[in-house]
Amino acid sequence: MSVTENGDDRTPSAPKHRQMLALLLMNANQVVSMAQFVEELWEYSPPPRAVAAVHTYVMQLRRILHGGATAVACGRLVTREQGYLLRVEDGELDLHLYESRLRAGRALLDAGEPDAGARLLRTADAMWSGTTGLVDAPTGPLLRAALAPIERERTEATVRRIHAELALGRHQELVSELCALVHQDLTHEELTAQLMLALYRSGRQADALAAFHRLRHALREDLATTPGPDVHRLTTDILTGHPRLEPPTTGHLPLTLDAVPTLVAA
């Protein structure tokens, strides 16, 4: 988390302040009620004077954000309807910019422009400085619930972007990235299937099969299940060297991946 204004660092350092600011930013330009603050900060065990503590934290947060000023009217954090609201203008919050680039990248993919769409999705993903959001701020139930769909959306966008890049014949460039992504989630079938295909197309059949066995083991141990039929078919095709797994001969193929037709986003 970082907050800057005209080059000045206004980032709060105390955990409660950071957590409150994160909740306000995740609900930018919307009222966060006192009940929401109490639930986020203390979950199911609020102290007797939780409401008073929230008021104190807000007062301190205002001073930090406003460079030591105490007047409510001089800043963006304002009192509204038994709660507080943080005003954020267009282009100020990186999350909003990320989501805008994500939508634009997906639109390009949908329009049949895999190269431009993949590049824009890569630009969006490069905005993340860590593997997950809010790595340096405490998260309670409300922040965890708000972050979950963002994380899912990011993973789905990554799958779509890699799908486009595989269709453009960039399998060798993708191997290292896919290895890292699969390492973060050993049970993710779509990413493992993409890794298997990239490895196979790079002349690494044995490594592609090893990736399948790691997936099967992780699914059995963690989820008590097995890989789906599409991953099994891909494995069979790798063993037999099916022609449909060959890399494209042109960078202008449609956005389909015959090797794993139902594992990638449409």
Please identify what each model-predicted range represents.
Residues E39, T56, R63, A210, ...:
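DNA-binding alpha-helical recognition surfaces that contact promoter or target DNA
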